[in-house]
């Protein structure tokens, strides 16, 4: 009886460990992908950078993209 309980606990531990590793290995978002609803999912060398959209001075939305860290983007006319 003790052997059955011990075996069950070991199997439960193994399954829990596998599930935890699978959650940590979620695919990351590559450069220029939208991250508005998932700001922490950009790949490690990228950052989720957000920009507000305005029309007639009023904000109408927000866009977020995975961009390189430390890079400054400027608007071209």
Curated annotation (Swiss-Prot):
GO terms for molecular function: toxin activity. Keywords: Disulfide bond, Secreted, Signal, Toxin. It comes from Lycosa singoriensis. InterPro entries: Spider_toxin_CSTX_knottin. Contains 4 disulfide bonds. This is U8-lycotoxin-Ls1m. GO terms for cellular component: extracellular region. It comes from the Eukaryota. It is found in: Secreted. Belongs to the neurotoxin 19 (CSTX) family. 08 (U8-Lctx) subfamily. Expressed by the venom gland. Pfam families: Toxin_35 (PF10530). Residues 1-20 form the signal peptide. Its main location: secreted. Residues 21-26 form a propeptide. The lineage of its organism: Eukaryota, Metazoa, Ecdysozoa, Arthropoda, Chelicerata.
């Amino acid at each position: 009886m003790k052997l059955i309980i011990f075996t069950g606990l070991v199997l439960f531990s193994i399954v829990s460990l596998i599930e935890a590793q699978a959650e940590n290995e979620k695919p990351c978002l590559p450069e220029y992908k939208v991250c508005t609803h998932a700001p922490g999912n950009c790949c490690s060398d990228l950052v989720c950078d957000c920009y507000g959209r305005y029309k007639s001075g009023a904000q109408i939305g927000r866009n977020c993209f995975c961009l390189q860290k430390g890079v400054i983007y400027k608007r071209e006319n």
